[in-house]
Swiss-Prot record:
MF GO annotations: adenine binding; adenine phosphoribosyltransferase activity; AMP binding
Cited HAMAP family: Aden_phosphoribosyltr (MF_00004)
GO cellular component: a single term: cytoplasm
PANTHER family named in the record: ADENINE PHOSPHORIBOSYLTRANSFERASE
Catalytic activity: AMP + diphosphate = 5-phospho-alpha-D-ribose 1-diphosphate + adenine
NCBIfam families per UniProt: apt, PRK02304.1-3, PRK02304.1-5
Organism of provenance: Rhodopseudomonas palustris (strain BisB5)
Enzyme Commission number(s): 2.4.2.7
Chief subcellular location: cytoplasm
Subunit structure: Homodimer.
Protein name (database record): Adenine phosphoribosyltransferase
A Pfam family hit: Pribosyltran
Entry keywords, A to Z: Cytoplasm, Glycosyltransferase, Purine salvage, Transferase
């Protein structure tokens, strides 16, 4: 990715200080999603390493991962798999508890969402501590998927999430970084 593109994408993300609590700067990608040129460029850049490769499914983490993941799935001509909060999917699911900053939560996937051996790219808008992505990768692997990559528009490297995912043996692709929380 060119430095100019990284600059443009970073400029298209709104920063909201002291949200959701004092001392946190929330990185709001809805401004990037609302800019057709920035959104297109971000999706094109996310999928670039897999152009021409076999990708069976793209899995997106609720909620912004659905938006980005759907666009990525379209670009790589694959199916899309939603990973949702507990109780939101209508069919039989497998569930995974994952760590939050303070406590735990659960995510789910339909039991038939991926087949053993399918090549899956995991997508979300942002990676911070990596807890949700880690849980999603464990769910996909539980169903027999090969998670070939995890892709995020924004990385908060100070929180260590991308490093955690790489330690699981999953390549991580991020487009832009913001320091701090």
């Amino acid at each position: 990715m060119t430095p100019e593109l990284a600059h443009d994408l970073k400029a298209s993300v709104r920063s909201i200080p002291d949200y959701p609590k004092p001392g946190i700067v929330f990185r709001d990608i809805t401004t990037l999603l609302g800019d057709p040129r920035a959104f297109r460029r971000a999706v094109d850049e996310l999928v670039q390493p897999w152009a021409g490769s076999k990708v069976d499914k793209v899995a997106g983490i609720e909620a912004r991962g659905f938006i980005i993941g759907g666009a990525v799935a379209h670009q790589v001509s694959s199916g899309f798999v939603p990973i949702r909060k507990k109780g939101k999917l209508p069919h039989t699911c497998v569930s995974m508890e994952y760590a939050l900053e303070y406590g735990t939560d659960h995510i789910e996937i339909h039991v038939d969402a991926v087949k053993p051996g399918e090549r899956v790219i995991l997508v979300d808008d942002l990676i911070a501590t990596g807890g949700t992505a880690e849980g999603a990768i464990k769910l996909l692997r539980q169903l027999g998927a090969e998670v070939v990559a995890a892709c995020f528009i924004v990385d908060l490297p100070d929180l260590g999430g991308a490093a955690k995912i790489r330690a699981m043996g999953v390549p991580v692709r991020t487009l832009i970084e913001f320091g701090g929380h």
